[in-house]
Amino acid sequence: MAVEALHCGLNPRGIDHPAHAEGIKLQIEGEGVESQSIKNKNFQKVPDQKGTPKRLQAEAETAKSATVKLSKPVALWTQQDVCKWLKKHCPNQYQIYSESFKQHDITGRALLRLTDKKLERMGIAQENLRQHILQQVLQLKVREEVRNLQLLTQGTLLLPDGWMDGEIRRKTTLLLGQTGVRENLLLFLHRISIIENSIQI
């Protein structure tokens, strides 16, 4: 469902138009598994802790493949996390970028707000290098938005202190019906449209 959502978007007037996402590659854990919560208008139950160990292990593996990996949100990344991301996505210019990013204290939140002008002020003079970084940041933003939408449809909450752990989630009832999912999808599409317009690839 979330991957299909990338092929359309909303303009400021609310009219659907194609989202220009050429060249963006997404690798989403659980891709291709349609959420039962949308079909049934309910959320899947957490498996009972009764049963054989083999059954519990099989249920845990099935649940793991259908959910999004709960990694740290980009906005909470440290300088070190940003440098790891740089090394993976910009290996050829990593030394230059990492020094500049460290000098300017670029954390995850700052990474998401980078612009062409900011990169130029940071000393990255070549336009093609700045555009490469911005393309990678755009892909990161899209992955983050897709993950957030998946977490919303699964009923996982992000609290100020971090992710809810499983025990609290079992005790908390989250009622997010079909209307809530639709509203979240529209919000997601609007955010993607804003991201595309801000980067202007």
Curated annotation (Swiss-Prot):
GO biological process, any: cell surface receptor protein tyrosine kinase signaling pathway
> What GO cellular-component annotations does this UniProt entry give?
cytoplasmic side of plasma membrane
Q: Which domain of life is it from?
A: Eukaryota
- Any idea what this protein is called? Sterile alpha motif domain-containing protein 12
**Keyword ATP-binding: yes or no?**
no
List, alphabetically, the Pfam families matched. Answer: SAM_2
What disease has this protein been linked to?
Answer: Epilepsy, familial adult myoclonic, 1: A form of familial myoclonic epilepsy, a neurologic disorder characterized by cortical hand tremors, myoclonic jerks and occasional generalized or focal seizures with a non-progressive or very slowly progressive disease course. Usually, myoclonic tremor is the presenting symptom, characterized by tremulous finger movements and myoclonic jerks of the limbs increased by action and posture. In a minority of patients, seizures are the presenting symptom. Some patients exhibit mild cognitive impairment. FAME1 inheritance is autosomal dominant.
Checking PROSITE patterns in the record gives: SAM_DOMAIN
Provide the tissue specificity: Expressed in the brain.
SAM domain: residues covered: 77-143
Q: Which UniProt keywords apply?
A: Epilepsy
